[in-house]
C-alpha cells in the first residue's frame, strides 16, 4: 500500500509499505493492504512501518490523524514527539 506520514513542516515517510502499526483512540491497530476505509485519531506512541523489503521504520508520535482510503492508501498527519 502507499503510505505517507506528514507533519505540518515535513514529510517523515512516503513510500510503499506492507504494514503500519499505530496507537489510535480505541487502541493499537495494524493496517495492511486492502484495509477497510477508516479515519481515526492517533494517540501518543511509536508508529512502526514495515516496508516492502521488510525494513522497519519507527516514528515517535505525540498526536495526529490517520485516513485509510480504498485503493490501498494510508495517510497520517502527525505531531512528532518532542526530543
Question: What is each of the regions a protein language model found here?
Answer:
Residues 2-83:
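Compact, glycine-rich, soluble single-domain proteins
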